[in-house]
Curated annotation (Swiss-Prot):
Protein name stated in the entry: DNA damage-binding protein 1
Chief subcellular location: cytoplasm
UniProt KW Nucleus keyword: yes
Single Gene Ontology MF annotation: DNA binding
Function: Protein, which is both involved in DNA repair and protein ubiquitination, as part of the UV-DDB complex and DCX (DDB1-CUL4-X-box) complexes, respectively. Core component of the UV-DDB complex (UV-damaged DNA-binding protein complex), a complex that recognizes UV-induced DNA damage and recruit proteins of the nucleotide excision repair pathway (the NER pathway) to initiate DNA repair. The UV-DDB complex may recognize UV-induced DNA damage and recruit proteins of the nucleotide excision repair pathway (the NER pathway) to initiate DNA repair.
Region WD repeat beta-propeller C: start-end pairs: 709-1043
Native source species: Gallus gallus (Chicken)
Taxonomic placement: Eukaryota, Metazoa, Chordata, Craniata, Vertebrata
Gene Ontology biological-process annotations: DNA repair; proteasome-mediated ubiquitin-dependent protein catabolic process; protein ubiquitination; regulation of circadian rhythm; rhythmic process
A single Gene Ontology CC term: nucleoplasm
Superkingdom classification of source: Eukaryota
Length: 1140
């Protein structure tokens, strides 16, 4: 068996459907967006879209339509999933609770039937008498809409027109009437039928039209007064209603194909049309009033409004605002203006919604060397193509920033005794101190009576008895708040300079070299209580009061130079309670006592970014449980701040980190800032609950996220990225991309728009000795689109395109790797290509090209001709492994810098994917699942170890460990195969057993090892091993990790219990949704835990949690079982959420 846990790190972002209507109430205008398995419900307000609820469906949304049957006060929602689960949903609000009620449900799958090539079509009769579905060729399925019916029952009507392209119900018909475009050997035609519910048959329709445009693809039913239907083709738009026929062929729509439409006015006089290039059109129906008062159609007109994201769906909201849902790029809210701008566009983007889909390729890199992966994806396509940099962390939202270099410390201050909020910020510099006054959001420099400004401040703050304190290198100064005046000053008896200081509201400890002085703060007096001498100089100290000690700390923590130790001293006596040798050469730079979740800790940060932390006993001063983590590479400064009424520690360094506690374990979270030298909390009128942060050049004031989440940065390419790899030595990414060019009259081609490959800092073009120009058998014609492929070299810091290398005409770049080969010290970018001609079934020629990038120049060092397409390449033990059509081939890199074939393996249909580990090679085939090869270095050949004999059409593969192999296939399933080394017969050993099966509901394009969270920081008890990330067509990022058998069994038990407690939307069984399902077979899921379901435990109410836990047995750690509590499960699930 194989035990795995699959969970979503980023929910799908590609929009595949949107509708508008009155779903939450009769008054609300709602926008409903389908993102594969997620349904998002918004209310349209004057300020924009307000999210109301997000629903996870147990299915891929194939049809989503709002309708209002007679007697209903608001709209109901009909949904059909890809596995044919149909349901009617209603929105119910009880106080703060929002429920999506399933009014009716059922599965409408047929046992036999060929799913139509044009996909699932679902339509609702305008009078709400029935729902029509076109699922299979030659059948039209009808679901009658009776109010009482809880179960959706359907019947089929035979359709002799097998190839239906699109179908709609017409308006204003006595009986429900469908109008459809279909194809037969003669061409495409339009036909109508009446649907008889009683006879369960079609009756002859009111009209038909034979031989419409050969590319006619969409039917739009027009409401009354016009009635009838509009048929949209590639070149023409026609209107039919039986009596009237009107056709127009506007040249502007020919350039591309119209893919979506939406009605603007209820009477159907205007329609929005969107095409594949992202252009938005308005179709206008001009009316003519007849003598008898009826209205007929006079003319059709199409106007180009402007450009949007490439639309998958459009919906008109209100007041000229349109939602553009996109699958290939970011979705948008756009405003349609009455007047055009300088570019002639009527469209203005108001808001953009990030979409990572389709993720075509991705790589995990640790760009900032901080032990945390960032994911860089090739996202989007055509003009929406981009790179997305995704990292997990805590965001800081900047509210103000001031250029102020050289800050050495900062503190908030309340200058008057009656103030609740901070109104000043004290900044320390070498040799001087400045005070900033905060007035609302305004910041101006000011002076404070009693403060000195010509010395560096070590500490400043509000202290007991309505006083302020300033500790500088020369003295400790106590200043009264009313009136502001110096009331007491303490200097070192011999006039030496203070080197380190710490202060709380009642106590001060300062260090002068090796001497320590302890002072107490009284009204208008600083009283020296004690002093002592340490054996080495003091590097850092802290007297933060912990527990309920009335603001007095009984302990003082210090870090010393020379012997590199941390010590706990008792106050006021300076008695040594504990001495901890930290080891190494690097001195402690910052020390802090703090309390997390009522446990006390000592944190001590060194000058190289290392952090030690210990449990601390307040009574004895003893340290326990020593642990160490690395937070950065530079000296770290520790400061506490409060957020959500819990204490957190901010570690300032080149890798700023927030430290907090969860389930009594310390958690370290990245902050999404480059570097922070100093910080302090700030709570002023203009900047409530904020942080002030200083780096080398700037002071920033901002608020901090309460939780860790994925942050996404976009680098637009305006063309399609295909493959990405990272090259550390040159600090660059290599990206394969393609742009579309159009053949012009002179025989050359021109780019449609500026994009990454045409705007690079430098560029080069392939010339090849391998292929003479006469090899191109294919002549392109005027106006034809051609793909131009490039290798882009992109800087890892600025993401600037440093170089673009263009491949040959008709040459498609398919695979990319950055690696060293043999004993050659250079690192190369290697690209695999194919010569693609329309008349060839599969490519017969291709190249492997070896590039070297250094000093801003890209050189092509070697090229190797191959007889086919180079689908995949990986570095393999210092050699190059490539899959070419059906062959897996290993190349050596010779001293002459040439690729020489070492061995081949031929037993595949089409070897698309390669992954390696040690001497093992996993091959993913187009249709023959996966195969495991071993390379025999002594014999210099491949041996076929085992294969999966199930026919799976693969979309991506990955090696989990030595024995387990992960695959994704084209029916949206995941499976794990296992090598059976213990099998007794050879035949059994040659079979890879399918030990894990699950339906993901997403098309996976890429797997890669890596993680989005800080690795091995702090303590973890997550029971998971390894981490494989995957990216999908819908922009979802997921994670697969392995479990032990005992954890799998516990989580499986929990999963089954959750399924009884959590009611699914649409009453779809979880077991049905996750069952492995292809055209050949359906099998129950096994070997996979649904992490999304497990994590939903944290969102249910306490009584429901109690239901899940009832009689659940867990291990008590000593091998005995005990009954689990709700808190046990919360802890376990919270641990699991932390892996992504």
């Amino acid at each position: 068996m194989s035990y795995n846990y699959v969970v979503t790190a980023q929910k799908p972002t590609a929009v595949n459907g949107c509708v508008t209507g009155h779903f939450t109430s009769a008054e609300d205008l709602n926008l409903l967006i389908a993102k594969n398995t997620r349904l998002e419900i918004y209310v349209v307000t004057a300020e924009g879209l307000r999210p109301v609820k997000e629903v996870g469906m147990y299915g891929k949304t194939a049809v989503m339509e709002l309708f209002r049957p007679k007697g209903e006060s608001k709209d109901l929602l009909f949904i059909l999933t890809a596995k044919y689960n149909a349901c009617i949903l209603e929105y119910k609000q009880n106080g703060d609770n929002i429920d999506i009620i399933t009014r009716a449900h059922g599965n409408v799958q047929d046992r036999i039937g060929r799913p139509s090539e044009t996909g699932i079509i679902g339509i609702i009769d305008p009078e709400c008498r029935m729902i029509g579905l076109r699922l299979y060729d030659g059948l039209f399925k009808v679901i009658p809409l009776d109010r009482e019916n809880k179960e959706l029952k359907a019947f089929n009507i035979r359709l002799e027109e097998l190839q239906v392209i699109d179908v709609k119900f017409l308006y204003g018909c006595q009986a429900p009437t469908i109008c459809f475009v279909y194809q037969d050997p003669q061409g495409r035609h339009v036909k109508t039928y009446e649907v008889s519910l009683r006879e369960k048959e079609f009756n002859k329709g009111p009209w038909k039209q034979e031989n419409v445009e050969a590319e006619a693809s969409m039917v739009i039913a027009v409401p009354e007064p016009f009635g009838g239907a509009i048929i949209i083709g590639q070149e023409s738009i026609t209107y039919h209603n039986g009596d009237k026929y009107l056709a127009i062929a506007p040249p502007i729509i020919k350039q591309s194909t119209i893919v979506c439409h939406n009605r603007v006015d209820p009477n159907g006089s205007r329609y929005l049309l969107g095409d594949m290039e992202g252009r938005l059109f308005m179709l206008l129906l001009e009316k003519e009033e007849q003598m008898d008062g009826t209205v007929t159609l006079k003319d059709l007109r199409v106007e180009l409004l402007g450009e949007t994201s490439i639309a998958e769906c459009l919906t008109y909201l209100d007041n000229g605002v349109v939602f553009v849902g996109s699958r290939l790029g970011d979705s948008q809210l756009v405003k349609l203006n009455v007047d055009s701008n300088e570019q002639g566009s009527y469209v203005v983007a108001m808001e953009t919604f990030t979409n990572l889909g389709p993720i075509v390729d991705m790589c995990v890199v640790d760009l900032e060397r901080q032990g945390q992966g960032q994911l860089v994806t090739c996202s989007g396509a055509f003009k929406e193509g981009s790179l997305r940099i995704i990292r997990n962390g805590i965001g800081i939202h900047e509210h103000a920033s001031i250029d102020l270099p050289g800050i050495k410390g900062l503190w908030p201050l309340r200058s008057d005794s009656h103030r609740e909020m901070d109104n000043m910020l004290v900044l320390s510099f070498v040799g001087q101190t400045r005070v900033l006054m905060l007035n609302g959001e305004e910041v101006e420099e000011t002076e404070l009576t009693g403060f000195v400004d010509d010395q560096q401040t070590f500490f400043c703050g509000n202290v007991a008895h309505q006083q302020l304190i300033q500790i500088t290198s020369a003295s400790v100064r106590l200043v009264s708040q009313e009136p502001k005046a110096l009331v007491s000053e303490w200097k070192e008896p011999n006039g030496k300079n203070i080197s380190v200081a710490s202060c709380n509201s009642n106590q001060v400890v300062v260090a002068v070299g090796r001497a320590l002085y302890y002072l107490e703060i009284r009204p208008q007096e600083l009283r020296q209580i004690n002093c002592t001498e340490m054996e080495h100089e003091v590097a850092c100290l802290d007297i933060t009061p912990l527990g309920d000690t009335n603001g007095m700390s009984p302990l003082c923590a210090i870090g010393l130079w020379t012997d590199i130790s941390a010590r706990i001293l008792k106050l006021p006596s300076f008695e040594l309670l504990h001495k901890e040798m930290l080891g190494g050469e690097i001195i402690p730079r910052s020390i802090l006592m703090t309390t997390f979740e009522s446990s006390h800790y000592l944190l001590c940060a060194l000058g190289d970014g290392a952090l030690f932390y210990f449990g601390l006993s307040l009574e004895t001063g003893l340290l326990s449980d020593r642990k160490k983590v690395t937070l950065g590479t530079q000296p770290t400064v520790l400061r506490t701040f409060r957020s959500l009424s819990t204490t957190n520690v901010f570690a300032c360094s080149d890798r700023p980190t927030v430290i907090y506690s969860s389930n009594h374990k310390l958690v370290f979270s990245n902050v999404n800032l480059k570097e922070v030298n100093y910080m302090c909390p700030l709570n002023s009128d203009g900047y409530p609950d904020s942080l002030a942060l200083a780096n080398n050049s700037t002071l920033t004031i901002g608020t901090i996220d309460e939780i860790q989440k994925l942050h996404i940065r976009t680098v637009p390419l305006y063309e399609s990225p295909r493959k990405i790899c990272y090259q550390e030595v040159s600090q660059c990414f290599g990206v394969l991309s393609s742009r579309i060019e159009v053949q012009d009259a002179s025989g050359g081609t021109t780019a449609l728009r500026p994009s990454a490959s045409t705007q690079a800092l430098s560029s080069s073009v392939s010339t090849s000795k391998l292929f003479s120009s006469s090899t191109a058998p294919h002549e392109t014609s005027f106006g034809e689109e051609v793909e131009v492929h490039n290798l882009l070299i992109i800087d890892q810091h600025t993401f600037e395109v440093l170089h673009a290398h263009q491949f040959l005409q008709n040459e498609y770049a398919l695979s990319l790797v950055s690696c060293k080969l043999g004993k050659d010290p250079n690192t190369y970018f290697i690209v695999g290509t194919a010569m693609v001609y329309p008349e060839e079934a599969e490519p017969k020629q291709g190249r492997i090209v070896v590039f070297h990038y250094s000093d801003g120049k890209l050189q092509s060092l070697a090229e190797k001709e191959v007889k086919g397409a180079v689908y995949s390449m990986v570095e393999f033990n210092g050699k190059l492994l490539a899959s070419i059509n059906s062959t897996v081939r290993l190349y050596e890199w010779t001293a002459e810098k040439e690729l020489r074939t070492e061995c081949n393996h031929y037993n595949n249909i089409m070897a698309l994917y390669l992954k390696t580990k040690g001497d093992f090679i996993l091959v993913g085939d187009l249709m023959r699942s996966v195969l495991l090869l071993a390379y025999k270095p002594m014999e210099g050949n491949f041996e076929e170890i085992a294969r999966d004999f199930n026919p799976n059409w693969m979309s991506a593969v990955e090696i989990l460990d030595d024995d387990n192999f992960l695959g994704a296939e084209n029916a949206f399933n995941l499976f794990v195969c296992q090598k059976d080394s213990a099998a007794t017969t050879d035949e059994e050993r040659q079979h890879l057993q399918e030990v894990g099966l699950s339906h993901l509901g997403e098309f996976v394009n890429v797997f890669c090892h890596g993680s989005l969270v800080m690795q091995n920081l702090g303590e973890t008890s997550t029971p998971t091993q390894g981490s494989v990330l995957f990216g999908t067509v819908n922009g979802m990022i997921g994670l697969v990790t392995s479990l032990s058998e005992s954890w799998y069994n516990l989580l499986l038990d929990m999963q089954n219990r959750l399924n009884k407690v959590i009611k699914s939307v649409g009453k779809i069984e979880h077991s049905f949704w996750r069952s492995f399902h292809t055209e050949r077979k359906t099998e129950p899921a096994t070997g996979f835990i649904d992490g999304d379901l497990i994590e939903s435990f944290l969102d249910i109410s306490r009584p429901k949690m109690q239901e899940v836990v009832a009689n659940l047995q867990i291990d008590d750690g000593s091998g005995m079982k005990r009954e689990a509590t709700v808190d046990d499960l919360i802890k376990i699930v919270e641990e699991l959420t932390r892996i992504h």
